[in-house]
Amino acid sequence: MSTDYSSPAYLQKVDKYWRAANYLSVGQLYLKDNPLLQRPLKASDVKVHPIGHWGTIAGQNFIYAHLNRVINKYGLKMFYVEGPGHGGQVMVSNSYLDGTYTDIYPEITQDVEGMQKLFKQFSFPGGVASHAAPETPGSIHEGGELGYSISHGVGAILDNPDEIAAVVVGDGESETGPLATSWQSTKFINPINDGAVLPILNLNGFKISNPTIFGRTSDEKIKQYFESMNWEPIFVEGDDPEKVHPALAKAMDEAVEKIKAIQKNARENDDATLPVWPMIVFRAPKGWTGPKSWDGDKIEGSFRAHQIPIPVDQTDMEHADALVDWLESYQPKELFNEDGSLKDDIKEIIPTGDARMAANPITNGGVDPKALNLPNFRDYAVDTSKHGANVKQDMIVWSDYLRDVIKKNPDNFRLFGPDETMSNRLYGVFETTNRQWMEDIHPDSDQYEAPAGRVLDAQLSEHQAEGWLEGYVLTGRHGLFASYEAFLRVVDSMLTQHFKWLRKANELDWRKKYPSLNIIAASTVFQQDHNGYTHQDPGALTHLAEKKPEYIREYLPADANSLLAVGDVIFRSQEKINYVVTSKHPRQQWFSIEEAKQLVDNGLGIIDWASTDQGSEPDIVFAAAGTEPTLETLAAIQLLHDSFPDMKIRFVNVVDILKLRSPEKDPRGLSDAEFDHYFTKDKPVVFAFHGYEDLVRDIFFDRHNHNLHVHGYRENGDITTPFDVRVMNQMDRFDLAKSAIAAQPAMENTGAAFVQDMDNMLAKHNAYIRDAGTDLPEVNDWQWKGLK
């Protein structure tokens, strides 16, 4: 017997389900005992500090109930992304009703005792968060920081052609920059190879204490707005459930059938033209089904519904009857049996097994997660038999490796960026793939654009690139986001949120592992001579270093072979944010592929061919982390050795900067004995660093050796020559060499003439670039001679 999913009888069950979800959601806000009000409510039943939000809840529960309906009707593989920031009860309540919550947390049983635990734990010490945190079944998006819901949904459905991301977007959230630009995602979803996103704009009209822009915008203008971005909005509006249920059911059916028609046409006819995707605009009051007013002020349909709408807590029970009336308005006796279990007629309409949105495998590590099939990075090695003689562009070399990663992993590896793949010299990838771009293509003026491709960089938005990558890796696939170093700061808060997700998810036994999030910082601070001061900011290194060390890796490979070795490590890793600072410009190549591998595996190494201490106690230790720091340090060592051949110099190259931290701060950190092996206990260390200097000072603070002289980025920059950026920050060879002399008191007299020579060279540099517009021949043509 077929089911009529639009019949009044079926929709009545949907209404009961919705009321049950609302009841659970209110109970989680206020109660810690007596969950079904089976006795009179007393103070000890109520939380001391009810914490959470109400305004978005009933609208989202309504949407969730109707998504369950279309899952049943059409046999969908669908998952839920909760964009509105403050609605943690939604996914908890619905996953509890469908049984997923109890499957994962068996102590939260589907009875009175389990319901009591469910209520008490919400926004409670030792309990669960008030957002859709990693503890929440079915969530890949916490929603604490607003704006990324559509980006995450799109990233998740890329290369998942059978999946639909039901993304609920708050009308307040839609005012954020990242969300506003993410509506353009239609231009990047290929209906042949990818799944679909069904955005549902939860238009309740208010934010914390202001109206929303969409809330005061007519349907006609909203329609025009979304149509301009290839969405077809379907409008549903009302506050009477008897009318809104059939209206939303009809709208959901229409949306799903349009999605299916788009995909059927595309897949059967190989038609990859840009479709017009459906979306739903759902207007219902903020705080729907809650208190209408309080103390003469409007609650439902106003900003006042945002958080805790009525003042009831354990210490103030004056208005407890209002809370009881609110809870009983959902008629819990029609919804739950006396033992707290859900009534059978409601259970009948809930999807089962993996069809439950909270149990969809995509939301827990992916549908079919696979490790990458990686080529042997050694096959791409650059010849360094004569150190520094070979000049290559690291990113071009690496792009050949990435090209073959794509070939070997055609369905689960992607590159993301904000229109910078070519600028960052990843040319090789386009030998095997294109940029995914669903808009019109003009062959005479476009390059590498196609409806299908493994590169998504055709939207100039760091937020989109980062959000897509996050959605992609949180659903079990692999990729990287390459961008200009300075403008990765645009998304450093997103990186923080991703770290927080990883940390919490890793603490849950039931959460599967995620591939790492790989961030490539190119066009770096000491290479931004042509774009100038605005493009010079290495601060993401410091920002990420402040996070829990188990989840953060920072690599500063000095040449192409080091970058190849780093790539092999990051693509095999899990549950990390790998931040790689690398070069795209022509540069001398230093380390053999085996040297590079050892440097990456150990994090650092003493470079024998650039050291003269022969394993004995050095007079001076030079350390370098980064491309320009390595070049300038080697040049400084050459200058010193030529003038002071008896000076015992040790050169330490650092690739994994955080490996230098104390094991008290970082489990991977070098022991004091290991640290002293490289840096000694008291000899002067001249450390050339790619980033802000305090990161290195912080590392040395816990160590024996405080005889440290750091040369990093000192917030000096301009449009000038490449070498002059280093001079401005005293991270050049002449200043490094001077620092080495100044750090050795015994050299005060014998080194005076040398220091003067260095000052003369700096003066010559300053005069020359202002006349010639380029760097000194002594700089541009410098070659490593070796240490005899």
UniProtKB/Swiss-Prot annotation:
Which enzyme class?
Answer: lyase
Q: What induces it?
A: Induced by sugars that are fermented by the phosphoketolase pathway (PKP) and repressed by glucose mediated by carbon catabolite protein A and by the mannose phosphoenolpyruvate phosphotransferase system.
Q: Which InterPro entries match?
A: Phosphoketolase, THDP-binding, Transketo_C/PFOR_II, Xul5P/Fru6P_PKetolase, Xul5P/Fru6P_PKetolase_C, Xul5P/Fru6P_PKetolase_CS, Xul5P/Fru6P_PKetolase_N, Xul5P/Fru6P_PKetolase_ThDP_BS
Q: Which reaction does it catalyse?
A: D-xylulose 5-phosphate + phosphate = acetyl phosphate + D-glyceraldehyde 3-phosphate + H2O
Single biological process term from Gene Ontology: carbohydrate metabolic process
Molecular-function GO terms, alphabetical: phosphoketolase activity
Q: Which UniProt keywords apply?
A: Lyase, Thiamine pyrophosphate
SUPFAM superfamilies according to UniProt: Thiamin diphosphate-binding fold (THDP-binding)
> Which coenzymes or cofactors are required?
thiamine diphosphate
Q: EC number(s) in its UniProt entry?
A: 4.1.2.9
Q: Which HAMAP family match?
A: Phosphoketolase
Give the record's subunit note: Homohexamer.
NCBIfam families assigned to the protein according to its UniProt record, in alphabetical order = PRK05261.1-3, PRK05261.1-4
Q: What is this protein called?
A: Xylulose-5-phosphate phosphoketolase
Q: Which organism is it from?
A: Lactiplantibacillus pentosus (Lactobacillus pentosus)
Name the lineage: Bacteria, Bacillati, Bacillota, Bacilli, Lactobacillales
Q: Which gene encodes it?
A: xpkA
